[in-house]
Amino acid sequence: MGKTLAEKIFSEHVGRDVKAGEIVLARVDIAMAQDGTGPLMINEFRELGFKEVKVPKAFLFIDHASPSPRKELSNSQKMMREFGKEMGVKVFDAGDGISHQILAEKYVKPGDLVAGADSHTCTAGGLGAFGTGMGSTDVAIIFGLGQNWFKVPETIKVVVNGKLQDGVYAKDIILEIARILGSDGATYKALEFHGSCIENMNVEDRLTISNMAVEVGAKAGLMPSDEKTREFLKKMGREEDFRELKADPDAVYETEIEIDATTLEPLVSLPHYVDNVRKVSEVEKEKIKIDQVFIGTCTNGRLQDLEIALKILEKHGKHPDVRLIVGPASRKVYMDALEKGIIKKFVELGAAVIPPGCGPCVGIHMGVLGDGERVLSTQNRNFKGRMGNPNAEIYLASPATAAATAVTGYITDPRRFI
Amino acid sequence: MVVKIKGKVFVFGDNVNTDEIIPARYLNTSDPQELAKYCMEDARPGFGRRDDIKGSIIVAGENFGCGSSREHAPVAIKAAGISCVIAKSFARIFFRNAINIGLPIVELKEADEFEEGDIAEVDLENGVVRNLTKGKEYRIRPYPEFLMKIMEAGGWLEYCLKEVGE
């Protein structure tokens, strides 16, 4: 019987053939924590008596509140840097960008097992790696032992066929998946993506979809590793990290869902749950006024996202009442955007361009909302209070919808601006 | 591990997420007692600072603990003195984190039959949950065998170290 991608990757990391449902000890290739979860992870690591870091690639990322807005957080970050020096663990610091983007650019290889103390570690699935989020204790154990126990997940096969119409993007596909599955529809399971739309999609878009696998409860969101993966790795200067990796044709899936990309419309997730998804064309009629638009994050803060948004804004201009915040996902994205003149244009358009990092998405700094205010963001999560104020509303959509909304001041279908 | 837990019930809904359990704006520290003060803050403001939550039981709906991987969420609940969380279902990362830090959690499909203020009793050893106020009794699915082994080994790290070898 054939294997799913999850079964293949776990079999390689356990050293024997494993099947969905088995609980296994598996070695981990890449482990990481960020400044929210890292301090607790380091405390646990020390409490458990570990003396050295045994996972092949271990990283610490200071991206959640970076540069630090408060002395308490500064002290935690200082502690992370000291730990990094002591243990020989590389620390990515203020200005470097978001963990998931940096991992995708520099380190993740198809077939890797990646464990991070951050729920969006599933982003690595975009490169055909099994990335999954865990707690601080679990990651401390991986730092110390190089392995951990996992349940090999059952897999939901997600088939996306057809070509997206203009103005509809990868973000709309994952919002459609959230609408279908609901916020716990894939709990304990992996998503595995198939179909012509996925095959024709670049890795940047695949990362957007995999990033939000956790929003339907999934443990991982796995893309095939194919020629598109090779192209991406080549662009990142590490083509040698490529290998083809696909599920077996006779793999066994728990369920299968199918999405017709050709009929998909721009979608928006309404407060306060990611699966509260509606068509932008319908919501537009309600003229929901938006105070702030945020284009960035590990979901949609890549170069092509900025380009898509800029194209619309350049042509139509920003509404004077909308605060526009733009956050490149990494130093590389920032540099590329600088070289292409994208940052200059955003600044001229009246945007606040913030340093690479999580920015306002985590609700600590750089764009906390006032009471009763509404934000439309390209991020992955719209829980009450997520962006720092439980009395604010968060709407989630693609960079194109975000840009169209920044043009008009209310939630707007981007198709008429393209 | 405490095998029999009894306490007053506080009822929460579906999809209680980690941003509600412990909002990021209070994550200035890893100190459990500090985190406890803001436990469930965005689901029920002031909850963590009430005098009557010590020893109580949180009862919730589907997908409890969804969202971020922050272990601070179960840590805050445990440090606030909550003795157990009963929910219709749990998000994966929260479930693992709770087991790892020793917060008893129980999946119970009939969780919505509890009302605020009911007295619940959880018998982990025999796999029974009782609503003492309403005089009802429910069988619960015991922890998976592997997790029971972890507990028998005296904790997850001990089990892992033993399995991995020196």
From Swiss-Prot, chain A:
Intrachain S-S bonds: none
Residues that bind [4Fe-4S] cluster: C298, C358, C361
UniProt key word Amino-acid biosynthesis: yes
Pfam families reported for this sequence: Aconitase
Gene Ontology molecular function, alphabetical: 3-isopropylmalate dehydratase activity; 4 iron, 4 sulfur cluster binding; metal ion binding
InterPro entries the UniProt entry points to: Acnase/IPM_dHydase_lsu_aba_1/3 (IPR015931), Acoase/IPM_deHydtase_lsu_aba (IPR001030), Aconitase_4Fe-4S_BS (IPR018136), Aconitase_4Fe-4S_dom (IPR036008), HAcnase/IPMdehydase_lsu_prok (IPR011826), Homoacnase/IPMdehydase_lsu (IPR006251), IPM_dehydratase_rel_enz (IPR050067), IPMI_cat (IPR033941)
SUPFAM superfamilies: Aconitase iron-sulfur domain
One biological process term in Gene Ontology: L-leucine biosynthetic process
EC main group: lyase
Reaction equations catalysed: (2R,3S)-3-isopropylmalate = (2S)-2-isopropylmalate
Keywords: 4Fe-4S, Amino-acid biosynthesis, Branched-chain amino acid biosynthesis, Iron, Iron-sulfur, Leucine biosynthesis, Lyase, Metal-binding
Cofactor descriptive note: Binds 1 [4Fe-4S] cluster per subunit.
EC number: 4.2.1.33
Function of the molecule: Catalyzes the isomerization between 2-isopropylmalate and 3-isopropylmalate, via the formation of 2-isopropylmaleate.
Record-stated family: Belongs to the aconitase/IPM isomerase family. LeuC type 2 subfamily.
NCBIfam families membership: hacA_fam (TIGR01343), IPMI_arch (TIGR02086), PRK00402.1 (NF001614)
Subunit-level organization: Heterodimer of LeuC and LeuD.
Protein name: 3-isopropylmalate dehydratase large subunit 1
Organism from which the protein derives: Thermotoga maritima (strain ATCC 43589 / DSM 3109 / JCM 10099 / NBRC 100826 / MSB8)
UniProtKB/Swiss-Prot annotation, chain B:
One Pfam family it belongs to: Aconitase_C
Catalytic reactions of this protein: (2R,3S)-3-isopropylmalate = (2S)-2-isopropylmalate
Keyword annotations of the record: Amino-acid biosynthesis, Branched-chain amino acid biosynthesis, Leucine biosynthesis, Lyase
InterPro entries on file: Aconitase/3IPM_dehydase_swvl (IPR015928), AconitaseA/IPMdHydase_ssu_swvl (IPR000573), IPMI_Swivel (IPR033940), LeuD (IPR050075), LeuD/DmdB_bac (IPR011824), LeuD_type2/HacB/DmdB (IPR011827)
Enzyme's top EC category: lyase
UniProt record, GO biological process: L-leucine biosynthetic process
Cited Gene3D superfamilies: Aconitase, domain 4
Domain of life: Bacteria
Gene Ontology terms for molecular function: 3-isopropylmalate dehydratase activity
Enzyme Commission identifier(s): 4.2.1.33
Keyword Lyase belongs to the record: yes
Pathway named in the protein's UniProt entry: Amino-acid biosynthesis; L-leucine biosynthesis; L-leucine from 3-methyl-2-oxobutanoate: step 2/4
Subunit structure: Heterodimer of LeuC and LeuD.
Function: Catalyzes the isomerization between 2-isopropylmalate and 3-isopropylmalate, via the formation of 2-isopropylmaleate.
Family that this chain belongs to: Belongs to the LeuD family. LeuD type 2 subfamily.
HAMAP family on file: LeuD_type2 (MF_01032)
Record-given protein name: 3-isopropylmalate dehydratase small subunit 2
Organism: Thermotoga maritima (strain ATCC 43589 / DSM 3109 / JCM 10099 / NBRC 100826 / MSB8)
